[in-house]
Protein backbone atom coordinates (compact mmCIF):
# COMPACT_ATOMS: atom_id res chain seq x y z
CA UNK A 1 0.00 0.00 0.00
CA UNK A 2 1.01 3.57 -0.57
CA UNK A 3 1.95 5.66 2.44
CA UNK A 4 -0.34 8.71 2.05
CA UNK A 5 -3.97 8.92 1.01
CA UNK A 6 -6.56 11.63 0.50
CA UNK A 7 -10.00 10.72 1.87
CA UNK A 8 -12.90 11.53 -0.45
CA UNK A 9 -13.87 14.34 1.95
CA UNK A 10 -10.41 15.92 1.43
CA UNK A 11 -8.34 15.13 4.52
CA UNK A 12 -4.90 13.50 4.31
CA UNK A 13 -4.03 10.28 6.13
CA UNK A 14 -0.84 8.27 6.54
CA UNK A 15 -0.99 4.46 6.58
CA UNK A 16 1.02 3.16 9.53
CA UNK A 17 0.47 -0.61 9.37
CA UNK A 18 -1.62 -3.43 8.01
CA UNK A 19 -2.86 -5.44 11.01
CA UNK A 20 -4.96 -8.58 11.45
CA UNK A 21 -8.29 -8.65 13.27
CA UNK A 22 -7.83 -11.03 16.21
CA UNK A 23 -11.07 -12.93 15.66
CA UNK A 24 -11.61 -12.93 11.89
CA UNK A 25 -8.01 -12.53 10.67
CA UNK A 26 -9.33 -9.84 8.32
CA UNK A 27 -6.70 -7.35 7.15
CA UNK A 28 -7.12 -3.98 8.85
CA UNK A 29 -5.51 -0.67 7.87
CA UNK A 30 -4.07 1.35 10.75
CA UNK A 31 -3.83 4.97 9.66
CA UNK A 32 -3.25 8.41 11.13
CA UNK A 33 -4.89 11.74 10.39
CA UNK A 34 -2.40 14.36 9.23
CA UNK A 35 -4.45 17.19 10.73
CA UNK A 36 -5.87 18.23 14.10
CA UNK A 37 -4.87 15.95 16.96
CA UNK A 38 -3.49 13.37 14.48
CA UNK A 39 -5.86 10.65 15.68
CA UNK A 40 -5.07 7.04 14.82
CA UNK A 41 -7.81 4.99 13.18
CA UNK A 42 -8.39 1.43 12.03
CA UNK A 43 -10.64 0.28 9.21
CA UNK A 44 -11.05 -3.01 7.33
CA UNK A 45 -8.68 -3.02 4.34
CA UNK A 46 -11.52 -3.97 1.99
CA UNK A 47 -13.45 -0.88 3.10
CA UNK A 48 -10.34 1.34 2.93
CA UNK A 49 -9.78 0.27 -0.70
CA UNK A 50 -13.39 0.31 -1.86
CA UNK A 51 -15.05 2.71 -4.25
CA UNK A 52 -18.12 4.66 -3.23
CA UNK A 53 -20.75 6.67 -5.05
CA UNK A 54 -20.81 10.40 -4.39
CA UNK A 55 -22.77 12.99 -6.35
CA UNK A 56 -23.54 10.37 -8.99
CA UNK A 57 -19.87 9.48 -9.53
CA UNK A 58 -17.99 6.38 -8.43
CA UNK A 59 -14.80 7.39 -6.60
CA UNK A 60 -12.29 5.75 -4.29
CA UNK A 61 -12.87 6.19 -0.56
CA UNK A 62 -9.11 6.81 -0.14
CA UNK A 63 -7.02 7.94 -3.12
CA UNK A 64 -3.26 7.33 -2.95
CA UNK A 65 -1.18 10.50 -3.24
CA UNK A 66 2.55 11.14 -3.43
CA UNK A 67 4.56 12.00 -0.37
CA UNK A 68 5.35 15.36 -1.98
CA UNK A 69 1.66 16.18 -2.41
CA UNK A 70 0.91 15.11 1.16
CA UNK A 71 3.78 17.23 2.51
CA UNK A 72 2.43 20.32 0.71
CA UNK A 73 -0.99 19.90 2.29
CA UNK A 74 0.36 18.93 5.73
CA UNK A 75 2.62 21.99 5.84
CA UNK A 76 -0.35 24.26 5.13
CA UNK A 77 -2.44 22.85 7.98
Where on the chain are the PLM-derived regions?
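Mixed-charge, low-complexity intrinsically disordered regions
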Residues: 1-77
